[in-house]
Every structure is written in C-alpha cells, then in structure tokens.
Amino acid sequence: MTISNTAKITPELVASHGLKPDEYERILKLIGREPSLTELGIFSAMWNEHCSYKSSRIHLKGLPTKAPWVLQGPGENAGVIDIGDNQAVVFKMESHNHPSFIEPYQGATTGVGGILRDVFTMGARPIACLNALSFGAPEHPKTRRLVSGVVAGVGGYGNSFGVPTVGGQVRFHTRYDGNILVNAMAVGLADADKIFLAAASGVGMPIVYLGSKTGRDGMGGATMASAEFDADSEEKRPTVQVGDPFAEKLLLEACLEIMANDCVIAIQDMGAAGLTCSAVEMGAKGDLGVDLDLDKVPTRETGMTAYEMMLSESQERMLMVLKPEKEALAEQIFKKWGLDFAIVGYTTPTKRFVVKHGGEVKADLPIKELGDEAPLYDRPHVPSPKLPVIHAREINAPLSVPDALEKLIGTPELCSRRWVWEQYDHVILGNTVQRPGGDAAVVRIEDGPKGLALTVDVTPRYCEADPVEGGKQAVAEAYRNVTAVGGKLLAITDNLNFGNPERPEIMGQLVGCLKGISEACIALDSPIVSGNVSLYNETNGRGILPTPSIGGVGLLDDFTKSATLAFKAADEAILLIGDTHGWLGQSVYLRDVCGREEGAPPPVDLAAEKRNGDVVRGMIHAGTATAVHDISDGGLLIALAEMAIAGGIGATLDPAPDSTVPHAWWFGEDQARYVVTVKQDDLLGVMTKLKTVGVPCTQIGITGGATLSIAGERAIEVTALETAHEAWLPAYMAAKN
C-alpha cells in the first residue's frame, strides 16, 4: 500500500532514531517499502533496548520464574504471587536512569509514577514503594544537585500520591559520575482471582484512552533510554516526562472502580513509548490487530502530528480494551473522577497495526513483528577474568580496630541514610510496621496478622569483581534481609543496570550476573516474577559498575512477631551465626581504610545461606531472638555498631580468636552471617539446637553499658558512634560546591 511521507528517510534520520543499518534493512524487507516518518518512529520505539530487550532476552529466558505461589511471571506489567486467603501481592522494579540524570526531579517523579501504574494496572492497590539510588563520587560537581533533585522527586511523587516509601539503597561511586541510577519498586495488594492482564481479546472491541491529555513531553524517551550519553546529553531535557501525582491518584481510583464494575477486557499503562507500546503490546499479546484514530486522542497542545502523538510519553495515561456493554458506565466513572475517556480505536482480526490521523493512514505495520517478534541478538560476550584471593594476613592494618570503626561508620558508604528517608512519608496509610533504617521494611497486610518484608539489594563492587558471585550475593543479601525481620522470601523482581552490551566484556558481566542470580533464586526457592533491563549506562565510553538491583518480597505469618536490629536490653548474649574467615577482598575496609579496591569478592555458599536463614527465622518465630541483624557491608563490627546505635545500648565484646587476623575478623565481609541476641535463660538451649543442626554459632559478647568495647581495645561511646554515623550526609548536602 502507499502511505504519504512528509520526510525523506535518510541514513542520518534512521541513526537518530537509534536504529542500526541492518535493522533498517530488516524493516524494508518486512514491510516491502520505505516506512513513513511515523512508522520509523514506531519501529524505533518498539525495537529499542528499553522496550524489546533485544540484547538480553535470550539470556533472561534462563531465569527461574515458576513456583506454586506464582500467579503471573515476567511478561506482564508486574509479577503476581499468591499469599493465601485470596490475597495476591503485585510488584515490580523499573529504572528511570537517563531521564533522572538529565532532569533529576522530574526524572525521579515519573519513575515512581510509572512503576505505580504498572502495579495498579494489574488491579492492585499500591501499598509501598522502595528505591535503589546510585550517584557519582561525592566530590563530583554534579553529585550534590543530582542527589537533591532525585530524593525530592521520589518523595514529592510518593508523598503526594499517598503511598509510603519504606526502604531502599543509596550509594556513591565515581563510576556513576556520568550515569546515575534511579531504580523504583512498587508493591500492591489485589484479590488473587481479580488480576487484570494486557492481552486483548475479541474482534471489534473498543479501545479506550484513559487519564491525562497527551502533550509533547517525553518525546523519544524510550529511545534515549537505549543509548549512551555524550557531552551534550544534558541538552535533552525535552525528552524528560513531567509527572502529576494528583492526576495519578485520580487515575488509580478510576481504574480500580471500573475494574470492580467488570468493565475491563485488557488494560495497559502508557509508559515507555507511550501510545505505541501500549497499543502494540495489547494487540500482539492477544493475536489481534489494532486500528487507532488519532483524531480521537485527547491532546493538550495544538497541531500535534501523528508522529508526536504516537511517541509522546506524557504521564498518567492508560489504554484499555473495554467490554462494549459497559461503555456508558466506564465513561461515567472516569468523568466522575475528572479524567479523559475517549474511544480511540478497535481491535481487528488482521494482526496489523493501523494508525490514522486527519483522515489519512499514517502507519500500517505487522503487529507481531513490532511486539514479541522484535529483533533478538546473541551478542558476543567474554567472562570477567578471575581476580586473586586476598589473604587477610597480607593486609597490614593502618589503624587500630576502634579507629577503623570510627572512620568507617561515618563514610559515604556506611553512614546513615536518615537525611534521605526522612524526606519520604514512610507511614502514610498506617500500615508500616518497620520503617527505613533496618534490614527490611515490614508492612502489615490490611489489619493483619500477615505482613510483607520488603528489601532492595545489590553490591556492585562484587558484581564487577566477579559477576557470577556478585549476582548470587545480591539475591542472598535480599534473602538475609527478609529473614532478619522474620520473613520468608517468596519471589524477587530485578532491575539489571549495565553498560554498553555491544562491548563483549560488558555483555559478559550481564551474562555472569544472570547466571549467579539464577543459581541463587533456585537454591533459595525465590523465583523472578518481574523485572527491567537498563543498558547503555555509559558516558563517553565509561560504563557504570554492573548493578543488578534485586527487589525481594517476603511473607510474615504474624507481623507482630517481626524482629528488629536494635539491642533490646542489657545482659543479653550476642551470638555470631555463620562461618567467619575474615574475607577482605572487595570489602569496604580494604577500600576506605587501606585504600585498595581489589581482590576477589567473598564467595557465596547458597546451601549455608539457606540453612542459616532457616535457623534464624525459626529463632524469631520461637521468640528466642531478641534482636537480629544480617552482616554485610563493613562486616561484623559495623553490624554490631548499628545494633548498638539503634538500641542506645552498648556491648562488651570478646577479642578476635587467636587463630584469626583481628581486623579481618571484625571487618571481613564473609557471607551467610547474622548477629543475634538472646536472653541468658535461652542461651544454652539455642546453642545446643544450633550445634545439633550444624549451624556455626559463637557467643562473642554481652549487651549493656554505654560503650562498644572490645577486650584489650579502646572503648567507644555509643553516642559518639551515633554522631559519626548521622553526620556525613546532612553535612554534605548542606555544603556548597
């Protein structure tokens, strides 16, 4: 067929749309003619990394995604797990990295808004948000502004929308100087028998546009998110979307109401690539065609072209396939909430994606090839070289153990994140049981007794040093954090942030991390049910640390029995659970005290993780554990200091065993470990049981007093540790560049 073309399709125009020459040749063969500008834009949106996962799909297929409690795995807007009593948890994590670097406030707000829509599109009411934020070195001139804007954006949207932000991560490293990471996670609650999906069904069904009007904001956002940055990237502000949390709140209530009234056949939020991606995905998943009439699309700007409307990423919009007999009711509901409602098309049996505007056909394309049959690459990849193991006795301690503790507790890596999370409303809705600052957030489900344990974890320096072990450790850390509050990890969502996949060494990092993640998910019985891939996180050829963020969701049968990390009382025994070898490779101590960022990261024994976690969870459920904290960044002594600070109670600690190197004993980052306190009356019984089941356990001290003191070393006031722990971030943010 003939479609009028107002723009000459040149190699430069093709390249500016993020399409490689061979991909353009594939388009020519597929449609048998030169595409129109609108069609080129549609292919650009659907075939970029952000929407098609063309570089990662072949490897993602190897991830474990099934379990008896998984109701919906990857491929929909979000994952869904069954938690009993006809209740389901709907959750996903997604990145908004590139927009947040260009315009930090709006980039972060729309990242939160987008992930919330993914959750309530499935029929769930959002109950919590988390995030993982990675910034450049503190001394970099842009870092302070980016931190300020992103944190304000995350808080501004979540607080206004009315969902608590209950946990997350914040890190600083020079490798994020040119590419910050903003990974947002949302969790919702739905009826297990009322989950809504994106696949259209039925021919001639009306396709309805819902929500806010379409403007020119966000043009080409998905394509920008699939490319490297260069020196001019900050000029791309027009491609950053603008969010309105109050409009999204109205959209949430309207969507849940039409769902409750059985109006919906299929529903899809308009996220990346806007109207294009939502319409194509609904049709392709249902083996149907879609006809759109753009003259019916509500717009807030005059003179918008078909190209602009199809690629706009204006926020707070949905596309729905409606039951025809419910049209009047659905329209009434949306008008009640003050939102646009317009029938913009119909499903067809043709498997074609047809777009009309001004009485002319602007696009006529095969819908399956746009969607789930987009290009698939098996890119060359090479494994990361193994780094040498650093033996503890090879590392001389430049500081005494107390001096090292005082230094580390206030570093950017280990200091308190209170300045960040106090800007988030973490108690709105009234269901937050454990606030930020612990191992995992705990949110009760309605009136209980069940609760959810929620966490986000990854250690990027481990992933770069050994992608396989780093991938395993990210999942194991999520498992430990959920366990430490008394939860059982049920499933995870991942957000895979990497550099340029066209470089074999970067592709090797992705493949290695996925291998480790897969092994850990299988061993810890926690399938992946949703996720996101963000590639090309590079600026001028310099990539980020590989950062596969893991969002974990666990279940507590009784939220009132959850554990916290704070010391509860004096004269309680302090137990170290798990093997300690003093692993210093890639540790915070080695980097920030010794000035060496090197060596192999700690190996992850998944069998030990499972065994130790089961025992600790059992202690929490039995009521014998009075405080629990997993040991991670900074090692054993940092964990103990955090417990002392949280409880306002000191501890007297035994010296490191004679067979160990003291600084490695206290600051090594061996995995599968916890600190647990128990009452003296329970000590013998606990130690006997742990020995019986083969779990390493050592009493290392006793709680009490106002200082943290190691036999033979200088004691440190807990209040001094708290001051050092809390000081750095507020002081940094208050300073001037």
UniProtKB/Swiss-Prot annotation:
InterPro entries registered for this protein in UniProt: PRibForGlyAmidine_synth_PurL (IPR010074), PurL_linker (IPR041609), PurM-like_C_dom (IPR010918), PurM-like_C_sf (IPR036676), PurM-like_N (IPR016188), PurM-like_N_sf (IPR036921)
The first-level EC class reads ligase
Pfam families assigned: AIRS, AIRS_C, FGAR-AT_linker
The residues that the entry says bind substrate are 95-98, 117, 241, 313-315, 534
Residue positions of the active site: 50, 96 (proton acceptor)
Question: What are the record's GO terms for cellular component?
Answer: cytoplasm
Known EC number: 6.3.5.3
Record has Cytoplasm as a keyword: yes
GO MF entry, a single one: phosphoribosylformylglycinamidine synthase activity
- The residues that hold ATP are 53, 92, 494, 531
A biological process (GO) annotation for this entry? 'de novo' IMP biosynthetic process
Q: Does the keyword Magnesium apply?
A: yes
Detail the disulphide connectivity of this chain as listed in its UniProt entry: none
Record-listed Mg(2+) 2 binding positions: 118, 269
Entry's localization field:
Cytoplasm
Q: Which domain of life is it from?
A: Bacteria
Q: Which family does it belong to?
A: Belongs to the FGAMS family.
Q: What does this protein do?
A: Part of the phosphoribosylformylglycinamidine synthase complex involved in the purines biosynthetic pathway. Catalyzes the ATP-dependent conversion of formylglycinamide ribonucleotide (FGAR) and glutamine to yield formylglycinamidine ribonucleotide (FGAM) and glutamate. The FGAM synthase complex is composed of three subunits. PurQ produces an ammonia molecule by converting glutamine to glutamate. PurL transfers the ammonia molecule to FGAR to form FGAM in an ATP-dependent manner.
**HAMAP family in alphabetical order:** PurL_2 (MF_00420)
- Specify the protein name: Phosphoribosylformylglycinamidine synthase subunit PurL
